[in-house]
Amino acid sequence: MKKIGFIGAYDKTDMLLNIAKILTTMKNKVLIIDSTINQKAKYVVPAINPTVSYITSFEDIDIAIGFKNVEEIKKYVGTTGDLTYDILLIDSDTEERIEEFELNKADKNYFVTSFDMYSLKKGIELLRNLKNQLNLTKILYAKEMLKE
């Protein structure tokens, strides 16, 4: 099972749904974990009986909302071994969740931001406050791109 972290204050929900859709089309079983403060996936992805923490399916993608770590997800699905997913996409915007989901041990981590001051400053603050060092690839978003 591959674990991929998406870190930063920028909203990553739509991007993760698009990545997950590509991965499921390639026959991968994918779980998106929304561990962000706002939990936007709760409002974007339909759920029949939403509770404080739950897993719902949307277009062959499973989405976990409200969990503090992978162990809570294992408990929810009733397993003590590894989860049955090929890929975990973990969306995080706090130091606590980065540590709880052990993203320092992830196969890959991406720092996702745009050029707005909030996303940049909050993202830098987040990275500065981490206890464990992370190897990151940055992704920048902009509404308008220059043709160069």
Where are these regions (language model features)?
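Conserved catalytic-core segment of NTP-binding enzymes
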Residues: 87, 92-148
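P-loop/Walker-type NTP enzyme "switch/lid" segment
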Residues: 2-17, 21, 31-86, 93-96
